[in-house]
From Swiss-Prot:
Pfam families: DHHA1, tRNA-synt_2c, tRNA_SAD. Its EC number is 6.1.1.7. It comes from Deinococcus radiodurans (strain ATCC 13939 / DSM 20539 / JCM 16871 / CCUG 27074 / LMG 4051 / NBRC 15346 / NCIMB 9279 / VKM B-1422 / R1). GO terms for biological process: alanyl-tRNA aminoacylation. Its cofactor is Zn(2+). Consists of three domains; the N-terminal catalytic domain, the editing domain and the C-terminal C-Ala domain. The editing domain removes incorrectly charged amino acids, while the C-Ala domain, along with tRNA(Ala), serves as a bridge to cooperatively bring together the editing and aminoacylation centers thus stimulating deacylation of misacylated tRNAs. This is Alanine--tRNA ligase. Binds 1 zinc ion per subunit. SMART domains: tRNA_SAD.
Length: 890
């Protein structure tokens, strides 16, 4: 029996298939969104939004109107369903093929059908395929029925709520690219339900009919409704294609498993969860197994991409996902950090496609473990809080739902665990009240998710009514006094906060900077008579109210209390990085040209990150020029000043404003009081900015760019360090250079020459070794490949040969030579270090698939592998075993 394709093989086949259709294969974009309107990348097309609007389709210097990707996506709008159903995921892989003004509906439909049903690709049963189309899209309906031959009864026509992307965009928006879509479904059979395709038309729900692919035809630019309330859809400059095939969905069909958690990626993780917890994957606890498995995969990818657990933005969402996993691990009996041990399994299954997982495995494991250690302590605090509530209640009474939700929202306490402990006291839980509070919080989260980044402290809108804007005194000082105006939790005003509790605190004035303009919010301490607390984060509302996330360490904090705020010493490092960001921006415009526009930034104590528009990677010379310009500003020790002025005056003075950013009538302008020279031209820095900065450029200290990478079409990302962080990084490089020089018996100054000489020697040795291996292979092959065994298998002429001491390129070269000399349709060459299968074009056209064959043979040879229809390879340890499986592999 043929082994089902692995998820990795399905991914590779998809990308290779579209490469054969003239598509440029691009790597996945980071889970960090390429634009500031969303926290995470939520769709395969997101990195290409500008291309859909007409921007040149050039990627790292390669022009291509056809692109294919495997995109890692994060969606958390319905995270509470993850694990409770077997289809919801917070992280999923979206396979996509895209056209920017090239092919359109006909090709998109034909190629999707070919890939799904073609025997050399996915081989799905054509009779089990069903589709939906937009009710007015006769063009797509015609292609499905007339070109493909799909019976009309296998097609449903739906309105814009179902078959338009974004859903119901004509009436509800958002503005921008949109168009009708056609969804492809697969009938999994009566084992998954006795409903029919006709039933699906009425219910829109089915476990039996699984959507596997959505073909979107973005051809319109949605505008505001006209005066009569009718949709306005203008034609885009050209018609586009945006498709999304759910990799996990297709894998469940191809592998014939009942759900995502039974596929080859999730199953090992679920089994490991059962092993760590001692709880089998069955019954009610299976929900927790699935939550832990899914969330650890999601968090591993998010953290590997550079998001750190925090109380703001992406870090806050990552923390929510991680803490939900920890809660469910706790319900399985895991009282000590264990989930970090699962990261290795995620890397094993996905690291080949996403090498950032491999490169950052240690950091991910350390981050997950630290979060486990911290939150398990918080869970214990929740237990104490619940015990305090229950101890004063009579048997037969009911714990109010708001208190149950506070335990969940503040301490991450599962309501199931709350109910279980309450029963020991003879107390029930108001589940309806809990559900009401939870739904209220979810509505706020969904609203923020739909339109962009939600505020960390969402849910306080009503509670904030009537509060004045906070007076910020932190530009000139890092400590200051203020009065507590409000204590907020779960959208409600509190009268006091006891020790061990965490909530949002509003002060009359504050030295803590509220996150904005790319600069992270300040942390530090609050102190008052008889108490103290940790300020974990600071945010700011649009109305200018500063929100401090405070954990009370000792004493009790009450509304009206006078407090003293002390900003963390990290502020100095943040200021260095923020001013350095301004200088970096000015230097980039000088070196790369005025077309450079800021696309986003993050300024923190440990580093700065700067996203900007530029079509190609920077050269080493350009990076050096930028670093030199910044260093000139630092050496000159110019004053850094700021003042508020009308926006028209600021723009007239040449202040740089962020493209697309909305400003008020009066703006704050930060200026470096001195220019530096670049090629005979004076370069200056003056920007609209509300952030905190150093007082003189000399305070920045050392500056170094540590990376330059592509994050989206036409968008680059620089990461850089300033001050102590830069010095430490440079010292580490110098130490590494000294150690390397010592190992090579030279000085650091002579390291380049020494390495160059060794490389030359190595290349010469490799060349000699390769030549010797080729000669050895030719000797073993015999004249004209006479040593090979040739026979008919599965309608193909197959030549096979075992070689000794041959691997890598020489093994592939031997396969090429044997294919030329033997006249065979397929050749199979094996050694105890590798296996190669190659097929002629004619053989591939007749259904041969080297990748499928190599998978079967590798399994018998103690290894695994895969590849394209015409060429595939594997690592094995038993050549005889692999070749011995040939007769049964066809």
């Amino acid at each position: 029996m043929t082994a089902p394709l692995t998820t990795a093989e399905i991914r590779e086949r998809y990308l290779y298939f579209f490469e054969t259709k003239g598509h440029l294969r691009l790597p996945s974009h980071s889970t960090i969104a390429p634009d500031p309107t969303t926290l995470f990348t939520v769709a395969g097309m997101q990195p290409f939004k500008e291309n859909f609007m007409g921007a040149p389709a050039v990627f790292d210097g390669q022009p291509s109107k056809r692109v294919t990707t495997a995109q890692k996506c994060v969606r958390v709008g319905d995270i509470e369903n993850v694990g409770r159903t077997r289809r919801h995921l917070s992280l999923f892989e979206m396979m996509g093929n895209f056209s920017f003004g090239d092919y359109f509906k006909r090709d998109a439909i034909h190629w999707a059908w070919e890939f799904l049903t073609g025997p050399e690709w996915m081989g799905m049963d054509k009779d089990k395929m069903y589709v939906t189309v937009y009710k007015d899209d006769d063009e797509a309906f015609g292609y499905w029925t007339q070109d493909i031959g799909l019976p009309a009864e296998h097609i449903h026509r739906f309105d814009a709520d179902e078959n338009f992307w974004p859903a119901n965009a004509p009436l509800e928006g958002p503005n921008g690219p949109c168009g009708p879509c056609s969804e492809i479904y697969y009938d999994r059979g009566e084992n998954y339900g006795d409903d029919t395709w006709g039933d699906y038309y009425q219910t829109r729900e089915s476990a039996r009919f699984l959507e596997v692919w959505n073909l979107v035809f973005p051809q319109y630019d949605r505008q505001d409704l006209d005066a009569s309330g009718q949709p306005v859809l203008k034609d885009l400059p050209f018609k586009n294609i945006d498709t999304g095939m759910g990799l996990e969905r297709v894998a469940s069909v191809v592998q014939d498993v009942p759900d995502f958690y039974s596929n080859d990626v999730f199953k090992p993780i679920v089994e490991r969860v059962a092993e760590l917890s001692g709880k089998p994957y069955e019954g009610e606890t299976s929900v927790s197994h699935r939550v832990v498995a899914e969330h650890i995969r999601s968090v591993s990818m998010i953290v590997a991409d550079g998001t750190a657990f925090s109380n703001t933005g992406r870090g806050y969402t990552a923390r929510k996902i991680m803490r939900r996993a920890i809660r469910h691990g706790y319900m399985l009996g895991l009282r000590e950090p264990q989930l970090y041990r699962l990261v290795e399994l995620v890397v094993d299954s996905m690291g080949g496609a996403y090498p950032e997982l491999q490169h950052n495995q240690s950091r991910v494991e350390a981050s997950v473990r630290a979060e486990e250690e911290q939150f398990l302590k918080t869970l214990e605090g929740g237990i104490k809080r619940l015990g305090g509530l229950l101890s004063g209640m009579e048997k037969g009474s009911t714990l109010v739902g708001k208190d149950a939700f506070e335990l969940y929202d503040t301490y991450g306490f599962p309501v199931d665990l709350t109910k279980e402990i309450a029963e020991e006291y003879g107390v029930s839980v108001d589940e309806a009240g809990y559900a009401e509070s939870l739904e209220h919080a979810q509505e706020i989260a969904r609203a923020g998710s739909k339109y962009g980044k939600s505020e960390l402290f969402g849910g306080h809108q009503e509670a904030l009514d009537g509060l004045p804007a906070t007076q910020f005194v932190g530009y000139d000082q890092t400590s200051g006094d203020g009065q507590v105006l409000a204590l907020l939790s779960g959208g409600e005003r509190l009268s006091h906060l006891p020790a061990g509790s965490e909530a949002t605190v509003v002060l009359s004035q504050t030295p803590f900077y509220g996150e904005g303009g790319g600069e992270v919010g300040d942390t530090g301490r609050l102190e008052w008579d008889g108490g103290a607390g940790i300020v974990r984060d600071t945010q700011k509302t649009k109305q200018g109210v500063f929100l401090h996330d405070v954990l009370v360490e000792q004493g009790e904090l009450k509304e009206g209390t006078r407090v003293r705020g002390v900003v963390s010493p990290e502020r100095a490092a943040i200021q260095r990085h923020h001013t350095a960001t301004h200088l970096l921006h000015a230097a980039l415009r000088a070196v790369l040209g005025g077309g450079v526009q800021q696309k986003g930034s993050r300024v923190a104590a440990d580093q700065l990150r700067f996203d900007f528009s530029h079509g190609a990677a920077m050269s080493a010379e350009e990076i050096a020029q930028v670093e030199t310009l910044v260093s000139r500003w630092v050496s000159a020790n110019f004053p850094v000043s700021w003042r508020e002025m009308p926006i028209a005056e600021a723009k007239a003075a040449g202040a740089t404003a962020l493209f697309g950013e909305k400003y008020g009538d009066v703006v704050r302008v930060v200026r470096v009081e001195g220019d530096v020279d670049f090629g005979g031209h004076a370069v200056s820095s003056m920007e609209l900015c509300g952030g905190a900065h150093v007082s003189r450029t000399g305070d920045i200290g050392a500056f170094v760019i540590v990376s330059d990478e592509n994050v989206a079409a036409g968008v680059r990302r620089i990461e850089a360090l300033a001050g102590e962080q830069a010095t430490a990084w440079l010292r580490g490089r110098l130490n590494a250079s000294a150690k390397a020089a010592a190992l090579l018996n030279t000085s650091p100054e002579g390291l380049e020459e020494r390495v160059s000489g060794l490389q030359g020697q190595l290349k010469a040795a490799e060349k000699e070794t390769a030549q010797a291996r080729r000669q050895l292979a030719e000797a073993q092959m015999g004249g004209g490949g006479s040593a090979a065994q040739t026979r008919e298998l599965g309608g193909f002429k197959v030549a096979s040969l075992k070689l000794s001491g041959i691997e890598g390129n020489e093994l592939r070269g031997a396969a090429d030579k044997l294919l030329d000399q033997s006249g065979a349709d397929l050749v199979v060459i094996a050694s105890d270090k590798g296996l190669v299968v190659k097929a002629t074009k004619d053989a591939v056209a007749k259904g041969a698939h080297a990748g499928q064959l190599v998978s079967k043979l590798a399994a018998a040879g103690g290894g695994k592998g895969g590849g394209r229809p015409d060429m595939a390879q594997a690592g094995i340890t038993d050549a005889a075993g692999a070749l011995g499986a040939l007769d049964t592999a066809f």
